[in-house]
Amino acid sequence: LDVATGAGHTAAYLAERGVAVTAADISEGMLEEARKLAVERGLDISTRQHAAESLPYADTSFRLVTCRVAAHHFASVEDFLREAFRVLHPGGLLLVIDGASPEGAPVAEKWLQGVEKLRDPSHGRFLRPSEWGQLVQEMGFKVLRSECFPFKQPDLEWYFRTAGTSEANRSEVRGMVAQAPAEARRVLGLAEEEGKTVWWWPRLTLLARRPEVAKSAAQT
């Protein structure tokens, strides 16, 4: 199950490797893009429209739940994780990839959250890696791997295009970049390169397993 599949790239990657995939998204428009991608690549991918926080599947329906670069939009990450645990078969895996907030850098975190909210008003919040670890364990998962990799934001115009940012919000972001605090510049590597504004996002990759026998937070 690929939750918040968007244009379906993760679902397609898995299907190309022989995995039976259900691609799910709250947006019918995104599901249509995922279907187009599947047709282009000759892949058999099922699609379902629903929110991440309420999965319309029976318990233990899947052996893998994935969610790539989407969880920061969710109304409740806790509900998503609780539902992911429920629909996973015991021993099943959860893979989450998403932007993250830097640890121990509250000024940089506030700047990053503010910039992202202006770029894309549907943004909720980037969690810190430690918050992710705590939440998945509270829901009953065992963390197998949790790593942050730097992802380069190559230029402001690219950043705006990917979200269709309004002109008014673009102007506000440029102002925040110009007045960025020293901690944000240092922690995020905010700089000018060949006339382009760049910085480095923390991107979390988290792999967790539903134990063979365990109680979830929803069952306690």
Where are these regions (language model features)?
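Conserved Class I S-adenosyl-L-methionine
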Residues: R145-T220
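Conserved acidic residues
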Residues: R63
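Short alpha-helix
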Residues: R125-M139
